[in-house]
Amino acid sequence: MPKVLHVADVHLGARPYGLEERRDDIFRSFEFVVETALKDRPDAVLIAGDLFDKPKLPLRDVKQAVELVRALTDAGIPVLAAHGEHDTPSVRDETLLSLMEASLDGFKAPLYRSGMRPGDFVVDLGSLKVAVVPFFKVPLEERRRLTLRFLREFDQISRTSSGTLVLLAHMSLDAEMQFDAVASPSDLPSGAKYAALGHLHAPRIRLDAPTPYAYPGVLDPLKVEEINTPGSPLYVDLSGDAPIIEKVKVPRRPQYRIEVDIGDGGSIYNAVNRGLRRVLANVRASREDWLKPLIHVIIKSDKPISKARVIAEARKAAGGADVLLKIHWKIVAGGEHAGTSPGLQGEGPLDLAKIAAEYYKIPLNAASTILHDLAEAAAEKDELRVREILETLATTVSQDTWKRILYMR
């Protein structure tokens, strides 16, 4: 009976913080997934969107990705991928996934083209059928309308289809994340045995839903906020009345987070050194692999600071420790220099995330994430990533909001 390996949000080609080591980490994690599948031989590997981090990548990244997927298809293991927002270009064009589909027997990644119907997105693997929801890079209301249309037709197909039907999609459900949600759990096909979903980087498993569904989470944490909730590929056994899920533990580079508050005017070196000593003691006690730990140092301050000085002293505090350091900056609200604007009135510091959330009518945590991503991309001089983030915002914010922004005086 069918057994599938469900993975999502792989982001091949990503280079978090501009580190080539992190690019290699992500490929190493996906290689582990491939090796696991080759050993256990599931009936299919399902990739629920964002196999790639960008629609266009260096040829080196594409070549390595193709070689890994080919190892599965050459072994007779079908691989099905849904498109996500990261591997779908803004303009209607061929994608890296569609090019892979054309060149690899056994790899399917249906790409929506004008005139296609939902039935064209059902991949028949014999006793297992997979209904793939295409990703529509259009404004949110239109994406929601198109997605619901596919889900309704997949529901009809699921009621009459023989064998086991699984839904594969890269989308948010409103029960998990209101921001950019396109459907509710009740909209999932009632006759589907399981919905293999992607998009949420924090894992979710909901086997008690009317149609059981899960988000494996991000394969390798891309942000410091994700290191405590890493994802896990999921083995899903569909042979019984209800899916049985087993998490696959992926060996990863250890990542640690320390926060250093230098707002009290004390020694930057001493503050960083104390935090690093605590983490390094834990690293030495628990280290089991050959990869250098990545230590995120969160510098908190309520006043202007010399970033060059902080970086120099943080590196000095790390001494000869065999680690990777990433410095993050966090302005603490309420300080004298936390933020002012001569044209705005009100009490307290300027909260850009709150302003963006209220202005664009999106949740506060979503606004914070967007601003964080923009800051990281700008710091790394990644113009393409900046453009992609802005395009995501443009397709997420409602048309009424954009009209209000464009026509306000």
Curated annotation (Swiss-Prot):
Coiled coil region boundaries: none
Regulation: Nuclease activity is regulated by Rad50.
Residues that, per the record, bind Mn(2+) 2: 50, 85, 170, 199
Cofactor entry: Mn(2+)
UniProt-annotated binding residues for Mn(2+) 1: 9, 11, 50, 201
EC primary class: hydrolase
Pfam name, any one: Metallophos
Recorded superkingdom: Archaea
GO molecular function, one term: 3'-5' exonuclease activity
Entry's family note: Belongs to the MRE11/RAD32 family.
Known role: Part of the Rad50/Mre11 complex, which is involved in the early steps of DNA double-strand break (DSB) repair. The complex may facilitate opening of the processed DNA ends to aid in the recruitment of HerA and NurA. Mre11 binds to DSB ends and has both double-stranded 3'-5' exonuclease activity and single-stranded endonuclease activity.
HAMAP family in the record: Mre11 (MF_02044)
Protein name: DNA double-strand break repair protein Mre11
Organism, as annotated: Aeropyrum pernix (strain ATCC 700893 / DSM 11879 / JCM 9820 / NBRC 100138 / K1)
